[in-house]
Structures are given as C-alpha cells and as structure tokens.
Amino acid sequence: MNPVAFSIGSFEVRWYGIIIALGILIAMTLVSINAKKKNLNFDVILDLFLWCFPFAIIGARAYYVLFELENYHSFWDMINIRQGGLAIHGGIIGAFLTAFIYCKVKKVDFLAYADIVAPAFILAQGIGRWGNFFNQEAHGGQVTSEFISKFPEFIQRGMYINGAYYHPTFLYESIWDIFVAILLMIILYNITDRYKGVVISAYISLYSLGRFFIEGLRTDSLYFMNIRVAQLVSLLGIIIGIVAIIIIVSRGKKKRKGIFIN
C-alpha cells in the first residue's frame, strides 16, 4: 500500500495528513453545531484550537520520545516527526492542559467548552486512525488468513504486510471511537447544564476503556518496566473519568435538579 496520495515536485502529500486534516474539518464543524446548541461562543473554540493544536503535537512527540529515548541520539532526531513517532495520549494531555490554562487565563468556563468539544474530538480520533491504515502501522499481531477473510477485501490487502496478515487494530479503535462519539452526542444534547463536565468525563473513561483492551493486541506499544504505557494510562483514565462522573452527578442531585432535559 502506498502511503503517498500524490506529489508536488519533490514534496509528498501523504494520506495520513489528508485524513488528519479531514478529521479536524469534520470535528470543527461538529463543534460549531454543538456551540450553537449550547449557546457558547465558537470564536473561543477557534482560539483554543490555535493554542491546543501545536501543543498537542509537542505533547504527542514528547510522550513518545520519553519512552523511546535510547533510539534518539540528537535533538533533531527528537523533533523530526516526518519519520513518525506521535503518541495520542501525549497529544490528549498536551491539548487538555493547554485548554485548561487558556480557560483559566481568559476566565472561560472550561467544563462547558470541554463538553461540546469531547464528541468531536473522539470522532476526529476515529477518523484519524485510518491514517494508520494507509501507513500500515498501529496494527496488532499476526492472524490467520481465515480470520482476516471476514473483513472487506481492502482491509485484507492493507493488513497484508511482509508476507503475513495482522490484526486491524486501527479499525477496532476507529469503530469504538465513532460509537463513543455518538453516545457522547446523545448525552450532551439531553443532559442539563447543572451537570457540566459529565460529557468530557465520559469521554475520558470510555475512550480509555476501549484503548485499554485494544492496546493489548498491538505490537508497537511503548513500555515502562515491561508494562504497556498506554494500558497504564488508560487504566488511570477509566478511574479518573468514573470518579469525576460520580462527583458531578452527586453534586447535581444535591441541587434537586433532574439530570436530563425534559
């Protein structure tokens, strides 16, 4: 499979970049719809994007390099992302911290904006996973031809690498992410404003739940003391998300208000 969509002179335009751009475009469109529904200022979202996107890239790269330090021998190697090496957890952490700081400085309601962004963010993640497909990366271990035959033919071709078939873990995560995006949209449009933070908390816990199990199938995991880093971070995400939901809902009930819009 050719990861290059087309070339302009010596400059290669890769499918990965096209798909990421498409994911961002769709996500921003969805956020604009959510902002209008919740009477929030979309200009704030645009400002957040301009700040969060570069710091998400920095976070994704720093996270990856941190656990692969032995493979990098110069500062240029560390910052050269053209050769790959971005970790989604690092990107999420980078974007989350940047958004939190921005909202504090600008005195913007962080949870309100985080809730309308969460469904779009995980939808973009689900779309972005198809970039891994074109790069033939982020796959699982070897599988039999009988197993892979259950998938569409183009998936079979894409997962045939160096004479063997592999688990299309990118597909598993993409499906899970899109499912979670739909679920978060349902929650967002039906929950009262008294429960701000529930949607972003559900995102953290549900994304982490899917990633925890899918990570166990992958062959390119980052490790810390023989522990898959992504599974450890996902486990923490599940706990943090669930605890946050419990706290938010319990506080809301004390106000004697219903959880859902009538």
UniProtKB/Swiss-Prot annotation:
Q: What is its EC number?
A: 2.5.1.145
Q: Is-annotated flag, keyword Signal?
A: no
Is Oxidoreductase tagged as a keyword? no
- Mind telling me which Pfam families this protein's record contains? LGT (PF01790)
Keywords of the record, alphabetical order, are: Cell membrane, Membrane, Transferase, Transmembrane, Transmembrane helix
What enzyme category does the UniProt record give? transferase
The metabolic or biological pathway listed in the UniProt record of this protein is: Protein modification; lipoprotein biosynthesis (diacylglyceryl transfer)
Any one GO biological process: lipoprotein biosynthetic process
Family from the record: Belongs to the Lgt family.
In Swiss-Prot or TrEMBL terms, this protein is called Phosphatidylglycerol--prolipoprotein diacylglyceryl transferase 1
Q: What is the lineage of its organism?
A: Bacteria, Bacillati, Bacillota, Clostridia, Eubacteriales
